[in-house]
Amino acid sequence: MSTKKKPTITKQELYSLVAADTQLNKALIERIFTSQQKIIQNALKHNQEVIIPPGIKFTVVTVKAKPARQGHNPATGEPIQIKAKPEHKAVKIRALKPVHDMLN
């Protein structure tokens, strides 16, 4: 199996690409992205769903508590006790149909 790392667009590269496409300066683009991030964070804190066009959905979900259980160390086979995990909130990020359609 190949372990080659896929190419990634960095934050600065994204700012440059958006600036070139919109003909706005990078400082303004950075302020827009920072503002968007703050708005998303605030919405998620208030359990609101956020959809970013064309179709990326952020949702707050509650992860159920998990009791302590018996497990084993896969390397040695030695039995171990796995700690209980309390109920907590997590962010679920999902690509909607328009994003999936872009790939096909």
Curated annotation (Swiss-Prot):
Induction: Expressed in the late phase of the viral replicative cycle.
InterPro entries registered for this protein in UniProt: Hist_DNA-bd, Histone-like_DNA-bd_CS, IHF-like_DNA-bd_dom_sf
Pfam families reported in the protein's UniProt record: Bac_DNA_binding
Keyword terms, alphabetized: DNA replication, DNA-binding, Late protein, Virion
Function of the molecule: DNA-binding protein that plays a critical role in nucleoid compaction, genome replication and DNA replication and transcription. Binds to both ssDNA and dsDNA with a binding site covering about 15 nucleotides. Displays DNA-supercoiling activity only when associated with the viral DNA topoisomerase 2.
Similarity-based family: Belongs to the bacterial histone-like protein family.
Full protein name: Viral histone-like protein
